[in-house]
């Protein structure tokens, strides 16, 4: 039996200042160690002040997952010895004696209706970034630290070990990412904005933690590898040790970093510099009223409003920018089935193949409407539409501009097509005889015609004309 639990660390990218000081959160691209202050650096005597907007963001997430919200925020010191936190403790939260998490309980449902329970949500600060200039963590000759990230406001979302398959872990993270995007508190497309620690055990064995995994896809890969590694150890009669491992995405393996600490090793106790922050009922209700439309509600609305399938609605909503593109385009293009088909089966598939996200695309509503209109009036074929998608996505060129520059307008002249078909039939006599016995072979002949016409012929029309020529 496989048990998987996740600890997800979410950057609150919507916040303008760090969690306990007034340093700006826009550190990406800045020179190392330039966005810091005595609080970020953990200097003696520096007094932290809690950013109230982080509390509001945590309450939004708690409401979105139906969690129980605490009546106060108690920050604790989590002690550990590691260079990414200069003061040798992280200001965080913990659900234990003398402390309380901002929320506990709650759940997220997967597509098969399986419920993944949430244990708690913590508010905490991000540590500094560790840089390995001459290689990886294991091979670099020395290590550098960039404290620009130190103190960045985070939410730690801890699940119960309710997942039993790496695919479920990936789906959970994709669903959580969609919730965060719709709430507008975090931009998951930014590097490092959402990272996960995965805890996994097999057949009642010791728990292994895989730290700091960068994406839902990598979480799935890391867990698949770790399950195979642990099963191999058990098969050899060896013991699975309680330990912390690192996911090497380049080599696609987990690597031992240290023995796993027990919770008591962190020596949690309330931070004396941060008094408890009161969370009132009125504050919670005000935030509840201001919540935007959440993914599950949006999925139901898309199905009802546009008549698309629940599966297609799920695919759209899992990435907010894709769902937004669909709805914006649907205002002026009413063939919703055709629109969702080209978005999911062509546009999204191409992006996934190139490891790109919809937010990285230059395609707009204007591009999509023009592309679909050109298809509808027969100016281009679906094959041409697929062929020009990369130029639309990467360069932002209009479809009409691309087909004009490359002479890609569809061939509608049937007399011309019949001449091309006759030429193909004379060249492919064996295929012609086979086609008369097996109509599926006609697809081969259609392909030959498409090649001769540079994909500018409509394959459906070509198919019908070939049948007519062959008397089928």
Swiss-Prot record:
Gene3D superfamilies the UniProt entry points to: 1.10.10.410, GatB domain, N-terminal subdomain
PROSITE patterns according to UniProt: GATB
InterPro entries with a match to the protein in the record: Asn/Gln-tRNA_amidoTrfase_suB/E, Asn/Gln-tRNA_Trfase_suB/E_cat, Asn/Gln_amidotransferase, Asn/Gln_tRNA_amidoTrase-B-like, GatB, GatB_C_1, GatB_Yqey_C_2, Gln-tRNA_amidoTrfase_suB_CS
Enzyme Commission code: 6.3.5.-
SMART domains according to UniProt: GatB_Yqey
Biological classification of the source: Archaea, Thermoproteota, Thermoprotei, Sulfolobales, Sulfolobaceae
Family that this chain belongs to: Belongs to the GatB/GatE family. GatB subfamily.
Superkingdom field: Archaea
Transit peptide keyword on record: no
Subunit structure as annotated in this protein's UniProt entry: Heterotrimer of A, B and C subunits.
GO function term, MF aspect, one: glutaminyl-tRNA synthase (glutamine-hydrolyzing) activity
Record keywords, A-Z: ATP-binding, Ligase, Nucleotide-binding, Protein biosynthesis
Leading EC class: ligase
NCBIfam families assigned: gatB, PRK05477.1-2, PRK05477.1-4
Nucleotide-binding found in the keyword field: yes
GO BP, sorted A to Z: glutaminyl-tRNAGln biosynthesis via transamidation; translation
Designated name of the protein: Aspartyl/glutamyl-tRNA(Asn/Gln) amidotransferase subunit B
Reactions mediated catalytically: L-glutamyl-tRNA(Gln) + L-glutamine + ATP + H2O = L-glutaminyl-tRNA(Gln) + L-glutamate + ADP + phosphate + H(+); L-aspartyl-tRNA(Asn) + L-glutamine + ATP + H2O = L-asparaginyl-tRNA(Asn) + L-glutamate + ADP + phosphate + 2 H(+)
Native source organism of the sequence: Sulfolobus acidocaldarius (strain ATCC 33909 / DSM 639 / JCM 8929 / NBRC 15157 / NCIMB 11770)
Function: Allows the formation of correctly charged Asn-tRNA(Asn) or Gln-tRNA(Gln) through the transamidation of misacylated Asp-tRNA(Asn) or Glu-tRNA(Gln) in organisms which lack either or both of asparaginyl-tRNA or glutaminyl-tRNA synthetases. The reaction takes place in the presence of glutamine and ATP through an activated phospho-Asp-tRNA(Asn) or phospho-Glu-tRNA(Gln).
């Amino acid at each position: 039996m496989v048990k998987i639990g996740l600890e997800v660390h979410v950057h609150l990218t919507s916040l303008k200042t760090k969690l306990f000081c007034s340093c700006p959160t826009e550190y990406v691209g800045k020179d190392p160690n330039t966005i810091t202050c005595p609080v970020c650096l953990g200097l003696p005597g520096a007094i932290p002040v809690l950013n109230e907007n982080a509390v509001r963001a945590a309450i939004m997430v708690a409401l979105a997952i139906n969690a129980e919200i605490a009546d106060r925020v108690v920050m604790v010191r989590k002690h550990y010895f590691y260079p990414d936190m200069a003061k040798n403790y992280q200001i965080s939260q913990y659900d234990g004696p003398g402390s309380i998490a901002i929320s506990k309980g709650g759940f997220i449902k997967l597509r098969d209706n399986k419920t993944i329970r949430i244990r708690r949500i913590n508010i905490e600060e991000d540590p500094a970034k560790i840089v390995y200039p001459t290689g990886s963590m294991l091979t670099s000759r020395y290590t550098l630290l960039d404290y620009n990230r130190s103190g960045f406001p985070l939410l730690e979302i801890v699940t119960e070990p309710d997942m039993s398959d790496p695919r479920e872990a990936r789906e959970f993270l994709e669903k959580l990412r969609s919730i965060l995007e719709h709430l507008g508190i975090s931009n998951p497309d930014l590097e490092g904005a959402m990272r996960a620690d995965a805890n996994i055990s097999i057949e009642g064995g010791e728990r292994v933690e895989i730290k700091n995994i960068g994406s839902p896809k990598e979480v799935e890969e890391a867990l698949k590898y770790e399950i195979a590694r642990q099963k191999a150890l058990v098969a050899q009669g060896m013991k699975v040790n309680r330990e912390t491992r690192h996911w090497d995405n380049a080599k696609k393996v987990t690597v031992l970093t240290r023995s796993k600490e027990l919770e008591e090793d962190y020596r949690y106790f309330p931070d004396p510099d941060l008094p408890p922050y009161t969370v009132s009922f009125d504050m919670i209700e005000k935030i509840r009223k201001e919540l935007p439309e959440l993914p599950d509600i949006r999925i139901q609305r898309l199905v009802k409003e546009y008549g698309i399938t629940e599966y297609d609605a799920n695919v759209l909503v899992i990435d907010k920018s894709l769902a937004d593109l669909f709805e914006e385009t649907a205002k002026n293009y009413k063939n919703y089935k055709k629109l969702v088909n080209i978005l999911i089966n062509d546009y999204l598939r191409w992006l996934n193949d190139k490891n790109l996200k919809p937010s990285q695309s230059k395609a707009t509503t204007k591009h999509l409407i023009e592309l679909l209109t050109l298809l509808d009036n027969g100016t281009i074929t679906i094959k041409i539409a697929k062929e020009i998608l990369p130029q639309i996505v990467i360069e932002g060129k209009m479809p009409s501009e691309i087909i004009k520059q490359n002479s890609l307008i569809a061939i509608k002249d049937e007399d011309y097509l019949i001449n091309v078909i006759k030429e193909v039939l004379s060249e492919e006599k064996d295929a012609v005889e086979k086609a008369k016995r097996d109509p599926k072979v006609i697809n081969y002949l259609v392909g030959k015609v498409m090649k001769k016409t540079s994909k500018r012929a409509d394959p459906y029309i070509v198919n019908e004309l070939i049948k007519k020529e062959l008397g089928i």
